[in-house]
């Protein structure tokens, strides 16, 4: 092998087969793609051990991608049920799946997942550590934390969330700046607990170079987690969040020195007018690295509808340059998502990504909308259904409510503007009262 | 009576009882409210014949309001079924209901609606004209169109959509600038048809002064309709739309000369990065009149999910100064909404309005979110439910998936960040493995 990672290849001027695939999918000139990868503006998460992967690029100028969270846990230990979700998520064209398994047969699940998934796979190794070692959190050693990451690399995981920006300095900032919801990142709170209980530095920060060696060995992309992301509107864009983002910027450069591909994770909860500033800050402080956000949720008051609060935030974020959206389901803040929750979350997230792509001018994004609108103008229902983000639902909705006239729908009936405009523009009369035509 | 309309009162320095109610609800100084009403920046739609009205203000500095569309039609003629929806819409705190009835016992429905509704009532009189006169559209006379408006005024309608900006000039612009989806406004397309079939000027434009006399007599607010609103991403912010908006600005001034309160209606479909410019244009060209938008829908490709595409657009619009959102349901582009569709539409729209209010800094808007986040930090589930935009759904979601530990939820179980942070910050240990606590 003439290169270690995709970034190393890009910097050496080598075109990998993954680059070729991404270049074709996105209709991006391969030299431009390679240059952006060399600069870290685009990543192709592709672990050398993930043989079934259909690679996707994430970053500048590319379509906004979405991630689906799954995994087994104490409250939901059924491997087969989760693998069923995986199949559907892939059918629904999620580009990434994060395995957040925290309990039970996590190794079996992860290996099956990597084996079957054409979508890229991400994990948060710290979730797996307690179960893997069967040791209480505070007793896990620094070396053991790193070994879990290595294990995930061996298993073919394409990107790992590592909360390396939570260090003694950012913890000081956190303690000085009171928050309403403290640390809401699951991995972040576990690391904070470990640091406090052991009075030690964050092992992922302290042994960051070793971590990078592991990532480079498998070409595992590092997704720098935002342990201090805001968990409420009140905490949005606060000192702790920005202090951590600055550390993530430093860690980005160190990763790039070792040709490790980097993604930056972002909020969280914030008022929608703060989103643009957050994207600008990330792109600046993290030197153009791809930005991956969880939401942002633009209000706290809608549990049961956080697929909507995050679709609002995600669309705005994507329009300003966010590259990768983590889906949020209606179950957020309430329970583990069911299969139906997952589907709703995927669709809301894909809508947000596409709305963002239209706004940021991703090449070809508006062709889809143009086709749909032309079908609407022609009242070509079959064409409309086939272009719908959810063909089945659109079809079902119309079928459940049959219109008087086949060309219109029950919303307007014979007052359908499309129907009447088409007639008038063809020089025909229109009628509302008569039923013969 | 010492004044004709709320605007007339405001200009004469008179404080009406409606102003007092709105001032208290919004916690806005009554003199500021009165001044803004005198300038046309705030309206209180309140027909003198709508006795059951609980008045609401719409405009600058006030909470963003939402409207629910209802009504009987050929495909859904059941008066009682629609009145049942009305009750639920009011229970769900929709501030406005537009009766879009187009067929059947529209008079009976409208009168019952006004009689029972504490929410303000709007109509689009042209929808009612064909049925009211039992005459084909093109045979309805100018005087008859105006008489329908008068009838709605007598019946106590608080605001009427009048597409007076579609005139011979704007039709010329429309014909010169090809569109993908032509005219998608139902009322707009009917008026266009009438104008083309009769080769005449738009009666609402030609007899605008007479129309204003009618509106002034009942203090019926005029909601200047956007006949030329874009119906597709491709047509967003085009020449026809802006040409009409300029006419609406002229008509606004003419209405204000007669103390008639004015709302401006807006898009429609557009890329999300165009929304801010649209709000700036409306506020400028229409001299600060309140802006009422249908969406905007930020993509065309999601029939079945247009409550989400419009929540994205509506939240952004509200954040930039839009004052009033027309709800959009999952049934948009497919069928008349069912009761369930209506509920989903109301909630999505309320989320958008509130997210906008947080961003534009409406007084007190963030208190709701702060309370919710404090409840989350305390893991006080009862408090969270009672603060939820949909208490029932939030409760049901949690109940359907019981967690191992009562304080957490099945999403994270014992890895709950709130739970663990609270323990660590109290100096306690945490455990993930042991089940005893």
Curated annotation (Swiss-Prot), chains A, B:
Binding site for [4Fe-4S] cluster: 409, 412, 416
Reactions this protein catalyses: 5-amino-1-(5-phospho-beta-D-ribosyl)imidazole + S-adenosyl-L-methionine = 4-amino-2-methyl-5-(phosphooxymethyl)pyrimidine + CO + 5'-deoxyadenosine + formate + L-methionine + 3 H(+)
Residues forming coiled coils: none
Binding of Zn(2+), residues: 269, 333
Amino acids binding substrate: 69, 98, 127, 163, 185-187, 226-229, 265, 292
One Pfam family from the record: ThiC_Rad_SAM
Details of cofactor binding: Binds 1 [4Fe-4S] cluster per subunit. The cluster is coordinated with 3 cysteines and an exchangeable S-adenosyl-L-methionine.
BP term (GO), one: thiamine diphosphate biosynthetic process
Keywords: 4Fe-4S, Iron, Iron-sulfur, Lyase, Metal-binding, S-adenosyl-L-methionine, Thiamine biosynthesis, Zinc
Pathway: Cofactor biosynthesis; thiamine diphosphate biosynthesis
InterPro entries hit by this protein: ThiC, ThiC/Bza_core_dom, ThiC/BzaA/B
Cellular component terms (Gene Ontology): cytosol
Origin superkingdom: Bacteria
Top EC category: lyase
Enzyme Commission number(s) from the entry: 4.1.99.17
PANTHER family linked to this entry: PHOSPHOMETHYLPYRIMIDINE SYNTHASE, CHLOROPLASTIC (PTHR30557:SF1), THIAMINE BIOSYNTHESIS PROTEIN THIC (PTHR30557)
Entry's family note: Belongs to the ThiC family.
Role noted for this protein: Catalyzes the synthesis of the hydroxymethylpyrimidine phosphate (HMP-P) moiety of thiamine from aminoimidazole ribotide (AIR) in a radical S-adenosyl-L-methionine (SAM)-dependent reaction.
Full protein name: Phosphomethylpyrimidine synthase
